[in-house]
């Protein structure tokens, strides 16, 4: 149907609505939202403003726009024609104002100047060109009143004037101007699709009432109401912040390989057939290989008190359990003279001369014969050695290897045990496979076979299974204290740990044990203000890079300890766990308000910023209930937190004021309508004279 036919249809009122206002206040988007049902994302709304005008000929060329222009307001069929205009003050809008039925005057609630121009420029211009045309004042961009202005300013074009908190106009500012001009006032948000129908339906009512005064014979206009009140907009609750856990740092694979090259805190020395020495660490070897686990476990059971008697000869006994056959060699009664163990509190300056170290090596006992237990080993004994990195003396387990164990493949084997990785370009794969067979490392042997068969892609699953077994063995060693070389004394007990694993997992521990601190030489380290349960959880995380699932302790205690050790990833994991537990309790109907209040400032103090943000969100979105139960606690919070509460509380203060004003004005209008209806009923009775015959 052609648009001209709307003018000819009986009882259809065609309304020409002109939309005016400053540039960039949202006139065109408001028109498009009504005429085309356009919805925009916040990114589109914040895009660079390009002055545009919505073309009036859309009603002629677009059937959908024409259909949407038709509506029924107060039982009156209407056809709404929207006229867009440029916001430049110097433009001539005389043609647009011609024969207009209503003018919608727009300003932005984020631009105080646009509201000032309503009084100083726009209203005067409207009354100059169409003095009898009704006007409706509209505050656009309502969503900016509750938006995150920092995010909004970041999303806008670089040279745009930033929107400040003081620029946002409260509803009463627009209402005061509307009252001064004697016109109705409404607010809209294209982003939230709020107020669009209110604005144009009430603009239509204003136009129809004005027309009714001139065309009083049109009976269908008698039911038209005066512009209605607009209920205030309740902004949606802000979504809770998502706890983001950063990418897990590497599980120490590269650091472990580096530790093999720079054997800090080494407690194993392999002696090859050509007297080449390779330092290593029991905990890495034992947790990666069952063969080495049996070897070092046998050593621990043979000499459980090695730390206190470095110079004593250790008698041999038959090892029963996991080993199959172990021959024991009796030592001579006149044992070799050994250098006593250094004082644990000695400083790093107490170094042993290299000649003395060589003398200890030359005079070392053959110890336990291992040739009958494994083809790869000859003997094992203990000595006090000088660490090549720290230059400090300490006990080491000296393992002499069989001449068949070549240096190159053995170093590759050790690197695999430390990192779980095998270089496909390794030269002596055959020698490595034979060595893996001798030491019963079947996963390494399979990986070598896959590489030789051009099927290296199959090694991924083997590597994954290797790391799972290693993690389980590490957790077992942590819980039992097996192969430990340091003990942490805490407020409520002690816990054993392993320096090599700590050095590779935590920079704080690496600085303490790898530097010149006295703790690097001590087997016992005192950590004040730490309980055993929290330290156990931190150590388990450092060993496995996972948070213990059976976490039965105060999250803030663990966060405080993780922050003390500079473990940001662990802090994020505990934050996520704490939020999950709080959310679960809230869903089950348990009040978490008091717990959240107690978490807030402690989380801020210990740099748990994500947990603090979640607590702030919970308090703000439940502000009324929290404040009613914990008013003193709310008032005791820091000034910054209280300012945040006031700014982000839900419902916001401006909404509560608007709701109160709306209810008050609504009651007043209902009283006026009731009085008006009584007045009309009295007038009807005054002109009604019933005759006795009719009665």
Swiss-Prot record:
Coiled-coil zones: none
Alphabetized CDD domains for the sequence: BACK_RHOBTB1 (cd18530), RhoBTB (cd01873)
Pfam families the record matches: BTB (PF00651), Ras (PF00071)
Disordered: annotated segments: 325-351
BTB domain span: 266-426, 484-551
Sequence segments annotated as region (Rho-like): 1-210
InterPro entries: BTB/POZ_dom, P-loop_NTPase, SKP1/BTB/POZ_sf, Small_GTP-bd, Small_GTPase, Small_GTPase_Rho
Expressing tissues: Highest expression in heart and testis.
Full protein name: Rho-related BTB domain-containing protein 1
Organism of this sequence: Mus musculus
């Amino acid at each position: 149907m052609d648009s001209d036919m709307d003018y000819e249809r009986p009882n259809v009122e065609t309304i020409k609505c002109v939309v005016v206002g400053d540039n960039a206040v949202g006139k065109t988007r408001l028109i498009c939202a009504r005429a085309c049902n356009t919805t925009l994302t916040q990114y589109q709304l914040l895009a660079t403003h390009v002055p545009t005008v919505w073309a009036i000929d859309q009603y002629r060329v677009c059937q959908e726009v024409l259909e949407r222009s038709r509506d029924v307001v107060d039982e009156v069929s209407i056809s709404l024609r929207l006229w867009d205009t440029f916001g430049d003050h110097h433009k001539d809008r005389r043609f647009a104002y011609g024969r207009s039925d209503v003018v919608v005057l727009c300003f932005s609630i984020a631009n105080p100047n646009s509201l000032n121009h309503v009084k100083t420029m726009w209203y005067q211009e409207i009354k100059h060109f169409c003095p009898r045309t009704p006007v409706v004042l509209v505050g656009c961009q309502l969503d900016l009143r509750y938006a995150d202005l920092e995010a909004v300013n970041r999303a806008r074009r670089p040279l745009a004037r930033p929107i400040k908190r003081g620029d946002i106009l409260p509803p009463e500012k627009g209402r005061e101007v509307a009252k001064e001009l004697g016109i109705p006032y409404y607010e809209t948000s294209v982003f939230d699709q709020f107020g669009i129908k209110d604005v144009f339906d009430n603009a239509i009512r204003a136009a129809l009432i004005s027309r009714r005064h001139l065309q009083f014979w049109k009976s269908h206009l008698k039911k038209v109401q005066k512009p209605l009140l607009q209920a205030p907009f309740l902004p949606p609750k802000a979504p809770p912040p998502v706890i983001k856990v950063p990418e897990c740092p590497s599980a120490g694979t590269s650091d472990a390989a580096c530790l093999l090259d720079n054997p800090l805190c080494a407690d194993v020395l392999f002696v090859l057939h050509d007297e080449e020495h390779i330092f290593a660490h029991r905990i890495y070897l034992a947790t990666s290989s069952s063969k080495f686990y049996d070897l070092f476990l046998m050593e621990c059971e043979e000499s459980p008190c090695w730390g206190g008697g470095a110079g004593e000869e250790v008698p041999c006994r038959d090892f029963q359990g996991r080993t199959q056959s172990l021959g024991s060699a009796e030592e001579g009664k006149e044992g070799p003279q050994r250098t006593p163990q250094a004082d644990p509190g000695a400083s790093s300056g107490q170094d042993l001369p290299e000649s003395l170290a060589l003398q200890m090596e030359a005079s070392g006992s053959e110890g336990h014969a291992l040739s009958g237990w494994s083809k790869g080993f000859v003997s094992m004994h203990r000595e006090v050695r000088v660490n090549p990195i720290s230059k400090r003396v300490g006990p080491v387990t000296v393992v002499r290897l069989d001449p068949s164990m070549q240096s190159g493949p053995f170093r590759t084997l050790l690197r695999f045990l430390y990192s779980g990785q095998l270089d496909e370009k390794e030269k002596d794969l055959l020698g490595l496979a034979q060595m893996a067979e001798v030491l019963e490392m079947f996963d390494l042997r399979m990986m070598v076979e896959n590489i030789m068969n051009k099927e290296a892609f199959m090694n991924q699953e083997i590597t994954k299974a290797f790391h799972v077994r290693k993690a389980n063995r590490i957790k077992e060693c942590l819980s039992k204290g097996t192969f430990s070389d340091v003990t942490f004394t805490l407020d409520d007990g002690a816990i054993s740990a392993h320096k090599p694993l700590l050095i590779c997992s935590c920079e704080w521990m690496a600085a303490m044990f790898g530097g010149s601190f006295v703790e690097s030489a001590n087997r016992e380290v005192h950590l004040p203000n730490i309980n055993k349960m929290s330290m156990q959880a931190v150590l388990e995380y450092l060993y496995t890079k996972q948070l213990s699932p059976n976490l039965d302790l105060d999250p803030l205690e663990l966060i405080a300890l993780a922050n003390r050790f500079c473990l940001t990833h662990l802090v994020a994991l505990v934050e996520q766990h704490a939020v999950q537990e709080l959310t679960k309790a809230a869903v089950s109907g348990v009040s978490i308000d008091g717990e959240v209040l107690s978490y807030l400032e402690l989380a801020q103090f210990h740099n748990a910023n994500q947990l603090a943000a979640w607590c702030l969100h919970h308090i703000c979105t439940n502000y009324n209930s929290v404040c009613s139960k914990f008013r003193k606690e709310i008032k005791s919070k820091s000034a910054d937190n209280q300012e945040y509460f006031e700014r982000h509380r839900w419902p916001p203060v401006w909404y509560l004021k608007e709701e109160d004003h709306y209810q008050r004005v609504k009651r007043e209008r209902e009283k006026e309508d009731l009085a008006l209806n009584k007045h009309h009923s009295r007038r009807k009775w005054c002109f009604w004279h019933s005759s006795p015959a009719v009665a």
